[in-house]
Amino acid sequence: MRSLGSNHSLTVVARMASLMLRDFAAEPRQSEPRPLGSDLRVLRQILASFVVFACVACAADLPYFSVLSDDAGAWPEILGSIGLQRQPAGVSRIFVARTGAAASVEWFARVERGAVLILEGESSLADLFGFRRSRKDPVRVQSLSDVHHPTLPIVWEKGLELPVFEIPEGAQVFARERWSGAPMTAGLKLGSGAILWVAAPPGERGYERFPYLLNALADLGLDPPFRSNRLWAFFDSAYRTRVDVDYFATRWRKAGIAALHVAAWHNFEPEPEGDAYLKKLIEACHREGILVYAWFELPHVSEKFWADHPAWREQTAVLQDAQLDWRKLMNLTNRECFRAVSAGVRALVGRFDWDGVNLAELYFESLEGMANPSRFTPMNADVRALFQQEAGFDPRELFGTRADEASRRMFLDFRAGLARRMQEEWLAELDISRRAKPDLDLVLTHVDDRFDTGMRDSIGADAARVLPLLDTRSFTFLIEDPATVWHLGPERYPAIAERYRALTPHKDKLAIDLNIVERYQNVYPTKQQTGTELFQLVHRAAGSFARVALYFENSLLPPDLKLLASAAAAVSRIEHMGPKTVIDSAAGVGIPWKGGAKVDGELWPAQDDETLWLPAGPHAIEPAPQAAGPRLVHLNGDLKAARAVDAKTLEFTYQSASRAIAIFSRVPVKLRIDGVDEAPQLAGPATLLLPRGQHVVTLATD
């Protein structure tokens, strides 16, 4: 807020305002909410004298926020998780006034002209807007209910005793203390702006108390500044057996999901009904511009394969069949078993129109390692014979008479080497499928063993042995967030990324898999990541890795879908330079946009009715007349360049590790790729399938 200065007439106005504010503050308290208009009538009289001091909203279209305190608390992490950027108050549109903030009637003009003001706790400024302590007894707050997910238990690790606040008439209560109903968060729209009030600070990390603050801001009209369309998500048809796949494909695309990794073991053996469902799912995804990967969980093959081949089942250290949790593990060291499984995998990859294959968790059980013999694998006869030939003893002795550390270390190292050879062997098998389908992308999902170093001994995972394969093979190394660190905060993702970057020069091939599930640890305020916690996780991960995958789409809660794509956007800079807006992003980004635009001085055809899509790097955007030609409304691939050629033609350059999918505003009629005429391969009326790699596309439409 700006100073009134030293002008004599301004001083008189300030004194008048002070007296009127004193009278206002002296009005008797009421126990029930009272109309905002009656409270603010006198303040609107003051406002007329203060119009000249209202800050000009010169940066209203920039996603800047300012915390009006030397101690910003967790607000930068909260607001930054959906792309808002911290800047000085003079250029910001969003303001956080922390507990004890001083009142100023200047705020009415700011809010009515578009500012968003967040009020934390009790203050004279909150009182000014009608959020004030009532005469009711304080309440002990330990649990909340929130309108965004009323049935979700929201439990605070440390309860607080808080006043019961009155809220102004017309305000919407978003969260209440679960038993008394006392308001904990509430919001109010004023003119073009809004007020969000919270009863207490949000917590050290920003999500300990009020998980849906960002959802409340969105309800009040705050639009996120960026969106990404690069997320991956895992999909298991067992949770979506009778759903409208067209509806869900549209929903996934709106949430920023670029690829679905579909549980392929359900279709390992041909079955008419299941195969028809999967074919329909793939077609629906392709129409919406979503890629579909076959997700394998070897050594689990399928229920039928397990039932049909008892002799090939994996064994635990107590010589029981390795049916562990939902996975029924097969002995892939056995050459007959391997040949049967590899033939089935090749057939499955060939039966459906996949865009890629994901080999996930291709190592051994379990997270408890040798401490739990009933879950420890592999202990089948083939592995035991191989190890005995090499080391001179049966590894089963490790769970009996041979308990020395040297022997134990010998087998654990052998086991990690076996897992690495198994991974390389299966990547080679998939290269055979790639010969028939050259556009297939390959992914190896591998649990983290750098951040949680115990994983190598527990399950045989050793990233340092696997990552050199990137020197000779083309695949994405998808790092799975291990269950042992699910309770840690989002700051772990930059740390994980740093450790893996030290192991390989192929940083663009590193991705991270976030498990969005109920955690077994004692975590607060929700058992599953949701709201601000989820957005912080996704945002930190997107800023640290080339790709972010979510396990799994069915576990994502409905309130999270609207802001998920914004949390996944990684933008380092946005600023005005004259009439242009400069945006710098790591992997390309979408920005809210209506009407035509120029990007870097050229008419830009890559936009839909609401979003303009930019390539990675810095780009200057400015308004322009709407181009008459076709538009590239969606691209599942990395956009490198685009230009409007004429009223019927556009040209763009893309790069993709898999097949790419492009959706246009008009029906394609003629296609040239790298200067060569090609027959359009359509997945929908205006949806085009494009080859893997980097290519220049020239498209003529009707």
Regions found by a protein language model. Give the residues of each.
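Helical hinge/lid and interdomain linker segments adjacent to catalytic or ligand-binding clefts
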Residues: 61-129, 250
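A glycine-centered loop/beta-turn motif at secondary-structure junctions
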Residues: 62-63, 77, 115-116, 165-228, ...
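Catalytic domains of carbohydrate-active enzymes, especially glycoside hydrolases
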Residues: 82-85, 242-267, 351-352, 468-478, ...
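A glycine-rich, often tryptophan-bearing local segment used as a flexible ligand/cofactor-contacting loop or short
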Residues: 99-180
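Substrate-binding cleft/loops of secretory-pathway carbohydrate-active enzymes
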Residues: 367, 423-493, 523-526
